[in-house]
Amino acid sequence: MSSANYISDEVPPDMVSPHDHRPSKDEPLKHLDTVIALYDFPGTQSSHLPLNLGDTIHVLSKSATGWWDGVVMGNSGELQRGWFPHNYVRSVNYVQPVLKKLKDNKDLDSITAANTAANVVMPSLTNLIQKSLQESERNSPANSTRKNSVVSFASSETSMPSDSKYTQQQTNTNQNSPEYQSISLPSTRDHSTVEMQLPSQQSSISHTLTGFGIGDDEIIPMEVEEAEKLVEEYRLKYNKTVTWIPRTSTKGDIIFYCEQLDVYCESLPLILFDGEASSPNLEYPGSDVIMDPTPISVQGSQSMENVLDTREGSAAGSFDSTKRDSNVSMSTQSSGSSYHRFSRPFFSVDNLFYKHSSDIGTWNELKEQCNYILDLMLKAIKDQNRQFFSTHFSRLNKLVVALCAAVRLNQEDYIDTKYENTTRRKLKRVCASFAQIYINGILHLSVLHYSLEGFNEGRLFGYDMGKLNRSSSSSAFQSPASSLSTIRQGSDDSTRFAQKLSQDRNSEGNGDMNYINQLVYEIDNLRENVNSIVKIFLKLSANKKIKNSDYDSSDASDDEGEDRFDILPQVYPRFLVDEFNGGNWCNPFFSTKNTVLNVSGDDLKNRYHTKIIIDHSAYDSLSQYVDKIVDACENILEALDPKVQNTFYYNEMLRNERNTQILRLTYKSLYHCSAMVDLIESFDFTVFCSVKRHTGNAIDTEDESYENPSVWGDHYDSNLSFDYPVVLEFFRLKQELHDLVAKIIMATQSLTLEDPEVFKGLKEEDPLFYNREISKIPKEKAALLLSSILKEQLSFKDGGAISLNPDTLLSGYLVEIAKTTKTVLLITQQLIEERETIINYATRVMQDNFDVQLLLVERNNTSSSEKADDNSYYVGGHKKSTDVPWYLEGDDEYELLLDVKGNIKGGSKEALVSHLTHHLSLDSNFNAVFLLMFSSMMSLGELISLLIARFNIEPPEGLSYEEYNLWVSKKRNPIRLRVINIMKLLLEKNWSMSYYNEPVLRRWLTFAHSDQVQTYSLGNLLVNYLERLLRGERIYVERDPVIPNTKPPAPLTKGSSLSKKPRVMDIDYVELARQLTLREFKLYCKITKFACLAKVWGKKSGLSESIDSITQFIKASNQLTNFVGYMILRKADPKKRVQIIRYFIQVADKCRQYNNFSSMTAIISALYSSPIHRLKKTWEYMNADALSNLKNMNKLMNSSRNFNEYRDVLKFIGSEPCVPFFGVYLSDLTFVYHGNPDYLYNRTRQVNFAKRAKTSEIVSGIDRFKTTGYNFQEVPEIQKFLDAWFEKCPTIDEQYQISLNLEPREQAVGASNSNSTTNATTNIKSFKPFSLK
């Protein structure tokens, strides 16, 4: 097999490719890399290298196909060589230290080959590594930041010096040492041997073979702690303190070197300071070491000319702000960087960061600022103003730094392009010119400052800078330009610069080059290069987008992105706009606008700030705390009772015992107070924050649709998107509870204090006299002093002074906290009722402007502690059957992900299509889900291509004649039959007009006409279907519901009996229920399964179906709700309103008997809406039976338990006609869509099939109730009556105003503070209904 073949086929090479160098028998073979296996790789061919989890492999070559050639050393020393896939391993720098740390950890035993799935990252080991690294970071000492380097993963043996000498730090491969052993490796293709050099003194190969292409002069930096130990031992032995000098490394970093110890460190080692010791006896390195400019090559890095070279050893590196090269391991990153996986820098887009007025956000602005500052610097030089020159240079310094940072952050744009070398070269020139501007500018201005009196103007500007140097005149001219020539060696400007120097010298006449000429040249040079760099990046940023996928470590992105042309990376540290979560602080009322930029991250936020749903379970827990707090307060108050003080505590010893007992009881109660505070602080207010509600005068002005945010007015300017009195009252009480707990602690401690005034606040300062003239008037000044005295006395009377009576003060606080906790309990009960009302109403009316995601957010916030690791739920691949030959096994089996029950959770498109047409098994449920949901995974063209490729499956190589015949009969023929059957099912039962694509259909038709397809009986049928589709005919038509052949019941209210202006009460409630049922069922049957998918999934569904049927159904249900409410509010007399309410309760109950849950829900939604439910005087006239019936129906449709009772009722409906409540289906579809990712592990190759299966199950439930229709007779007059009223009924907002006119809002009465809370809570629910966003 040729090299080209195996590269294109992506199979492991069987021999060294022609372009590779084949080592001879006697030639040592050097490794390229050292890696560790993360998975078991069994190896199915003789050329494969079998791997076990944790094996150390030395990579000898890397093929472009992704297969690497490596060697493994066994326990007995034997070597085995072969090919293995690169995605089964990770670099030793990444994995080895973690495995070493976890070698005795029981968690490692749980990592088995069962977790292996093709092209899926192994989650168990990854999570284990992450956990280990996070623990190591938390347990690291204060100076652990020194370890943020590659060498933190090196073992102690790597850099441990010998006992006899301190200068024993060895380089990775010492060219002067012959201590190497030759090991023979068996070749993978023949019996010849190759040699591999290994250092004999190393106990582990992995300690030596780290990094790519390590040179002979590379050094291994020592750990800081080890170096500090060596320094201390050296000081104790020789009574001298060594010194460290900084050296530059080949990758542009600073590394510290000690000549005495011959040790390198990436961080500066420190010694302990001993104040009693004498002055340190410092030992300095030699001058040759200090002056040596040779860069140091550090192990694990690659040679770089400057810090702008690629970080990962190739130009294809991705951005990571914490990495300098590819060998940086995970432990070198901070906890924040290990959490965020940003592949792009942030860009200075609008409304993302709080910006300073001086911040620069665009490339053009940067260019203009640079040009402007350079002009000012020239002017300052011309005006001989040293202060202005220094000021402008400081600004230029910031601009150059911003330019360098922007180029570095944006390097992914120019790497591997024709602009890469140009960009690097011009940036070097900018830095060089910047330095020369400062040097020549300062020298020029210094000459003017010190020599102005000694030289005339002619001599002044002809002054030679060489004369300032105390060197010979022959070298005087070379000194100012030496740095220029050194920096620009080999640059394109060399000739031009030399010509300019010659011109300048000739113009001066005396051969001198002055500072100002150099300065002007450098300014022009810097200006030119900055403009060129900006021009390059303007070209590079054209048509570039900022996408969320650049920041959430996924390769899936549905957003179109934001244009970033002419936008700089964010080079300034700034706060994010409207982000109030960070570190340990989370604000529950501000949701992040940029989920990928969330500082703390939603997962971290939920991990440390678990939220609790405000439900009856939370109420029960809160009630227990309140009971314990009240009991403790009563016990303390008994001990503080003034009546028993003289009887039982008549001496100091008894009073001390009493105080001790009070302290014990108080701190016991504080424990319950603390638990209660923690509980109420964890309440989740997602529902209240996500729904807008209006109070006060806002209702008078709101007459526009709340679907249009532009008409909301000034009432919505605040970021707080709720206005609930009950919520605000809850927060007021919560703060009051906090204050009381603090006061009780101080009051309790004051019982035993000798000086109770210790807790008294500092004396307030005298008020500021803004009018000094008035303060000079004696009477005015006396009045101010008198007011201060009276105010202080008043504070004493109010109990502000602890010294009056600590018992009385503590007793008052205990009484207050007992009342406050009971009030908090009452408010919590109202919060529960309000939350249920919001969710019930929002779900029942199925408002499009209601953000259903609020329920998802609430669920995610509260259930994080209960959720298992999603990654660990998936295991890979089908189990192979032992009695099936290998050539008859399923295809792409290991690309399927299964759950513990064997259901398919996901997989690649190819694997899913292979399972769809499997030759050994028929999974009908899987087929039905796939054919319904395939458009969300792939286009019709992709599906047909995969099916055709499946039909034309090729036999594997190496089959005998008998095996080939068996393969044809047992595998190929069944697969072909399955392919044709799948195509037939798609056209017959799962076709949507959204799929119509004429080129694809014609290609499909060509395939159907082929001889191979026509050999099957279904071939002609397939051709017929495709030709009909191309002619515009419909093949798939939903069946009409079956209506029984029996005679329908006669209408109880005939159209002829109704007057020209009928009233609703003229229609019999039974007949109205029938007519409503017919209307709802007709609209329900128009809803297709494809419309449901398009409604919830949107563009991701891959459908262009109309959702008008769903819109009309929701509109009709909401019109019925408005109709019922308005019919009640039209009556001014409360008793007549009661008659209408009783009538509609009967209608709703009859709808329930007809299984018309849609109309029933719409009616009870109207009766429980705020305009109707707030009419207390009206509800007082209702009889108990009607109220009980209404409560039962409301309980049936209660969403607090996910409609469990309603779902149970639906299960027992067989062949009877039914109109289900569509809002439940919408909620379920929305939860599945938003609560599950489209792809597993954020990889587009791994389709989340389980999400599609759940969606298909819900949609199938919708179609279930379309089969049987209602045998009722339609009354056109009643239908026209309903149509007329439905169109002109006012909205719920307008109805609320009518409700206020009928029964005005009650005002809370109560002047005292003790009653204000009670009055507020009893009337807290008298406000306007919410409008849904």
Swiss-Prot record:
Q: Where is the composition biased (Polar residues)?
A: 133-166, 177-187, 194-206
N-terminal Ras-GEF domain location is 900-1034
> What's the domain of life for this entry?
Eukaryota
Question: Any idea where the Ras-GEF domain is?
Answer: 1068-1305
**Database matches in SMART domains:** RasGEF, RasGEFN, SH3
**Gene Ontology terms for molecular function:** guanyl-nucleotide exchange factor activity
Cited InterPro entries: Ras-like_GEF (IPR008937), Ras-like_Gua-exchang_fac_N (IPR000651), Ras_G-nucl-exch_fac_CS (IPR019804), Ras_GEF_dom_sf (IPR023578), RASGEF_cat_dom (IPR001895), RASGEF_cat_dom_sf (IPR036964), SH3-like_dom_sf (IPR036028), SH3_domain (IPR001452)
Which spans does this entry mark as compositional bias, Basic and acidic residues?
17-27
Which GO terms fall under biological process for this protein? cAMP-mediated signaling; cell division; cellular response to glucose stimulus; cellular response to starvation; filamentous growth; filamentous growth of a population of unicellular organisms in response to biotic stimulus; filamentous growth of a population of unicellular organisms in response to starvation; Ras protein signal transduction
Q: Which GO terms describe its cellular component?
A: plasma membrane
Stretches for region Disordered = 1-27, 133-206, 474-497
Q: Where is the composition biased (Low complexity)?
A: 167-176, 474-485
Keywords recorded for this protein, A-Z? Cell cycle, Cell division, Guanine-nucleotide releasing factor, Mitosis, SH3 domain
Q: Where is the SH3 domain?
A: 30-94
Physiological role = Promotes the exchange of Ras-bound GDP by GTP. This protein positively controls the level of cellular cAMP at start, the stage at which the yeast cell division cycle is triggered.
Q: What is this protein called?
A: Cell division control protein 25
